[in-house]
Amino acid sequence: MTAQTNRQFLLAKRPVGAATRETFTYQQVPVGEPAAGQILVKNEYLSLDPAMRGWMNEGKSYIPPVGIGEVMRALGVGQVIASNNPGFAVGDYVNGALGVQDYFLGEPRGFYKVDPKLAPLPRYLSALGMTGMTAYFALLDVGAPKAGETVVLSGAAGAVGSIAGQIAKLKGCRVVGIAGGADKCKFLVDELGFDGAIDYKNEDVHAGLKRDCPKGVDVYFDNVGGDILDAVLSRLNLKARVVICGAISQYNNKEAVKGPANYLSLLVNRARMEGFVVMDYASQFAAAGQEMAGWMAKGQLKSKEDIVEGLETFPETLTKLFSGENFGKLVLKV
């Protein structure tokens, strides 16, 4: 590849079930020059998120779907190499919706500057980026945990779950994570300080909840949906809060999304289940980011990035999210 060539992955069709390489069109195009108000960014790292699967679907959502023939949407960090925008200078590092490509050329809507001297660039896609903001606001605003309460998280060894669980510990809660595999569960307890971990691949989730949550569940932070959501609903306490942050077990379904059978537990326990979209809190990101950075500086918050190299691996790397292969925040090094 030369400096004048931009490799891109475009959405070729709307997938039924899992996205595959055939879901995308790969192309190489010349790199243009920024027009008035635009910047040219050399992409360095791209964030791979479960939400990307939803962005491929047509229909009403919190954000318009990626259009057929458009560059696949992805958040990322990169360096400005040409600018025709007074707000950004050559050499600036930025975080924004860069797309699955080598270079971003366009208006920097919603972009903001980051400092590689303060933290490694991939961290601005994990704890210090949208992932961290999701964990922070979903837990603290929707979950509203109180010291001494029991907080359970699914997808607990993933990007959002691992950070949200640590924040719950900082708030004085008993924290139990649900993850797939002994290594992930060991990481939650030994490295992140969780009070318990349930290996859904090798043990019965109901039994694990009974063991690790003998007093029931006050806050459930759901990233997976499906049978695990149903199991936790059966253990809710009075006035419990259920945060619907994601449902990764359902995103690739070819049939209708499976609803919870135990939803009457919400009625009996006067509990609340609420959906969450991080962009609702955009005006508060700066203050939250300062608090998150402070926790990290004190060693109270750890961030794990799972970095895969090579833009050309994008379709296969994306599938790691849905098979549970990733360990921490999945990042693609361009």
Regions from the PLM with identified roles:
Residues 2-4, 279-334:
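C-terminal hydrophobic helical "lid"/dimerization subdomain
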Residues 204-215:
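Short amphipathic alpha-helix with an adjacent loop that forms part of the alpha/beta core around
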Residues 102, 180-188, 205, 257-263:
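Short, glycine/polar-rich helix-capping loops at beta-to-alpha or helix-loop-helix junctions
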Residues 72-78, 89-155, 300:
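NAD(P)H dinucleotide-binding glycine-rich loop of Rossmann-like/cofactor-binding domains
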Residues 125-203:
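Mid-domain Rossmann-like dinucleotide-binding core that forms the NAD(H)/NADP(H) cofactor-binding site
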Residues 95, 152, 198, 220-221:
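N-terminal Rossmann-like NAD(P) cofactor-binding module of classical short-chain dehydrogenase/reductase
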Residues 227-301, 334:
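Glycine-rich phosphate-binding loop and adjacent beta-alpha segment
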Residues 30-48, 56-100:
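Glycine-rich beta-strand-centered segment in the early N-terminal region that forms part
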